[in-house]
Amino acid sequence: MLSQLIERSTQYVREASLEEQNRIMPLIDFGPYVNQEPGAHERIIQQLRAACESTGFFQIVNSPISPDVVKNAFRASKQFFELPFDEKLTLSKDMFSNRGYELMEDFVLEGEEDSSSPLEISGIDFEAGSYPGEAPLPPSSIGYVLPPSSLANGEGSSMFDADMTTSNAVAHGDESISNEFRESFYFGNDNLSKDRLLRPFQGPNKWPSTAGSSFRKALVKYHDQMLAFANHVMSLLAESLELSPDAFDEFCSDPTTSIRLLRYPSSPNRLGVQEHTDADALTLMSQDNVKGLEILDPVSNCFLSVSPAPGALIANLGDIMAILTNNRYKSSMHRVCNNSGSDRYTIPFFLQGNIDYVVAPLPGLGPSTAEPIAVEDLLRDHFQNSYTSHTTSLEVA
């Protein structure tokens, strides 16, 4: 019974056929466009429009991102995950800035955690950017039980629901079983102003002291190249909507960004990431050659396991883009399951936009069916849901 709780549903997942993969995640060759070949610009616009109106997923080959920059970023990623566990824990994710190390792991028994692990969350004040009391924010050791008393006593903000007793976990008697199995390291723009450093979902970054300067330089260069390319893709997306190329410029000014180094240990029938949509406008993901991505197909209504082209960037649109385009462009459900027998490494870049930008359909795309929402509020809601929506509680006799 217990093992069934952590297995992915195989009833609604299968391998995508070549035709299905081309439909739900088409390949777009940027080479002719980068080389300014005749007709390439118009062709890219048409291909982007078709992909974004379908699932919002597409593959990019021959992008202007330097292969050496990507290679060095993956080298840094593997270097980080090979650090001693205790050292990684010293960089545990700060839940206000969304920076640092996060672990989603197997279950542990309540009451048997190491006494040095700070498990209780007494509240987080998002508005003030501070934490109640003097205790440090706990590491994101998902699978550890968060005592109900620490969440229901009214202290701090209401970021977490009062009845939430586990985070991304399945409660079974005195056990807590993680629904997800991965470890990750979050970082973002390394050159933010003092004012930006005080805002949610932004720096300062947490760099490991023993990794050396080359580690930081490799990841900063990766971030900067991905940001520049993401901004260019946004201008192409604006054109694909028959808008001015600068239609997204205000949204993209001084943007909130996030990058995650991700390692998914091989775990048959165990999800590395639960089904979800991204909160951002645009995600660009580099990956190794180990497959694991599953996309919800709107035609068959089942998850299809896809096999991205070697060296391709996986691009997908998030919830912010769906709102900006009045749902003309899609933010699709997806998840990860690595049953390859090898670790899977990916490095997604998230373009979340200016933290103060009010998200609503762009002019010319029709009236909004929902209330406009600031990027900061949308990200906060998404962040909260990520700690509650995948929690399963069981009544045990």
From Swiss-Prot:
The keyword Disulfide bond does not apply. One of its GO terms (cellular component) is nucleus. Keywords: Iron, Oxidoreductase, Vitamin C. GO terms for molecular function: 2-oxoglutarate-dependent dioxygenase activity; L-ascorbic acid binding. The keyword Isomerase does not apply. GO terms for biological process: small molecule biosynthetic process. InterPro entries: DIOX_N, IPNS-like_FE2OG_OXY, IPNS-like_sf, Iron_ascorbate_oxido_reductase, Oxoglu/Fe-dep_dioxygenase_dom. PROSITE patterns: FE2OG_OXY. Residues 255-353 form the Fe2OG dioxygenase domain. Belongs to the iron/ascorbate-dependent oxidoreductase family. This is Sexual differentiation process protein isp7. It comes from Schizosaccharomyces pombe (strain 972 / ATCC 24843). The lineage of its organism: Eukaryota, Fungi, Dikarya, Ascomycota, Taphrinomycotina.
